[in-house]
């Protein structure tokens, strides 16, 4: 049996955490031969800690063969001690009357502290995925707060947008999602992100040629993917939790186990590709191998695409400048 991998999950008793933990413990994220130790963080509030205890009792009651141990805590340094993987799910949700700016600042405090704790106690090659919104900027803050860790250790989740776009294309084409490749999603995990099927193929044939409808792309596809989260809240009365958990599992599994040359979307610190300033946490098409991701390079960007990329970049730059004073 392999040595267990230590996986930290923050916001562990929340909706996404509840949809996530049982799938990690069953081996869906890292493989059916990989034991895990779950290190679970919740708020230092009696109700949250009680809920966490209940979730841990349920995890015990599943008797997962791969669950080699659990820690539940309200201390980030305990949760992140020696972790190989950290899923930062917990974040401050937007309350009534809260401006986006207030939300940014409330979360900046959380992710500054979590970045510093990871910097202090996590494994040096820890893989960090930020799920809590605003995910790109929260990931940027955590990265900047962990100066001793490689910036490449930090990623933001755009896989939910990627999966949403895949499913819309599948429905439009009447083809299974498994056959659709080379989809890209650019930018921020927000309604400004740009799902781009110009390079995509379905069963080897060009998706763009098959759809051949720029009006559908601009007025149906892009806004449907961008506003899908809001549509789910409208329908369910709660935000998308199971699909977000599923995307987090996809993201980590592909990062750790590799994509075999297939493109996926990850929010990663830019290396200057496509004119995105270095260090901006931006959604790019990537491939992964041996636990490392590589941005897909040299794709032609047409005027239509550039306009969307500029817009989502402007939003990220604005978020970044809104928290700059906190990062020294």
UniProtKB/Swiss-Prot annotation:
Organism: Xanthomonas euvesicatoria pv. vesicatoria (strain 85-10)
Keywords: NAD, Oxidoreductase, Tricarboxylic acid cycle
Binding residue positions for substrate: 94, 100, 133, 164
Protein name: Malate dehydrogenase
Reaction it catalyzes: (S)-malate + NAD(+) = oxaloacetate + NADH + H(+)
GO BP, one annotated term: malate metabolic process
Family per record: Belongs to the LDH/MDH superfamily. MDH type 2 family.
Keyword Cell membrane among UniProt keywords: no
Cited function: Catalyzes the reversible oxidation of malate to oxaloacetate.
Annotated active site: 189 (proton acceptor)
Binding site for NAD(+): 11-17, 107, 114, 131-133
InterPro entries: L-lactate/malate_DH, Lactate/malate_DH_C, Lactate/malate_DH_N, Lactate_DH/Glyco_Ohase_4_C, Malate_DH_type2, NAD(P)-bd_dom_sf
GO MF annotation, one: L-malate dehydrogenase (NAD+) activity
Enzyme class of the recorded protein, top EC level: oxidoreductase
Annotated EC: 1.1.1.37
């Amino acid at each position: 049996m392999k040595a267990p991998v230590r996986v930290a999950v923050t916001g562990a008793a929340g909706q996404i955490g509840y949809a996530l933990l049982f799938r990690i413990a069953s081996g869906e994220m890292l493989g059916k031969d990989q034991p895990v130790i779950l290190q679970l963080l919740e708020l230092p509030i009696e109700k949250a800690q009680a809920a966490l205890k209940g979730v841990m009792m349920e995890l015990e009651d599943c008797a997962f063969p791969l669950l080699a141990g659990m820690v539940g805590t309200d201390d980030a340094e305990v949760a992140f001690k020696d972790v190989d993987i950290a899923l930062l799910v917990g974040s401050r949700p937007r309350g009534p009357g809260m401006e986006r700016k207030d939300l940014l600042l409330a979360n900046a405090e959380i992710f500054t502290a979590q970045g510093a704790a990871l910097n202090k106690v996590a494994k040096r090659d820890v893989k960090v995925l930020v799920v809590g919104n605003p995910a790109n900027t929260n990931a940027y803050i955590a990265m900047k707060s962990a100066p001793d860790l490689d910036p490449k250790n930090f990623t933001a989740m755009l896989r939910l947008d990627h999966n949403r776009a895949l499913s819309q294309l599948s429905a439009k084409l009447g083809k299974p999602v498994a056959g659709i490749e080379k989809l890209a999603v650019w930018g921020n995990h927000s309604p400004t992100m740009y799902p781009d099927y110009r390079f995509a193929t379905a069963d080897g044939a060009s998706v763009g040629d098959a759809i051949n409808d720029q009006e559908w792309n601009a007025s149906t596809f892009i806004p449907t993917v961008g506003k899908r989260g809001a549509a789910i809240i409208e329908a369910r009365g709660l935000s998308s939790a199971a699909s977000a958990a599923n995307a987090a599992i996809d993201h980590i599994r592909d990062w750790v186990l590799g994509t075999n040359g297939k493109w996926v979307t990850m929010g990663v610190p830019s290396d200057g590709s496509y004119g995105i300033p270095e260090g901006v946490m931006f959604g790019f098409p990537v491939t992964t191998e041996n636990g490392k991701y590589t941005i897909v390079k040299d794709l032609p960007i047409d005027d239509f695409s550039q306009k969307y990329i500029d817009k989502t970049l402007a939003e990220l730059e604005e978020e970044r400048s809104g928290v700059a004073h906190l990062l020294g």
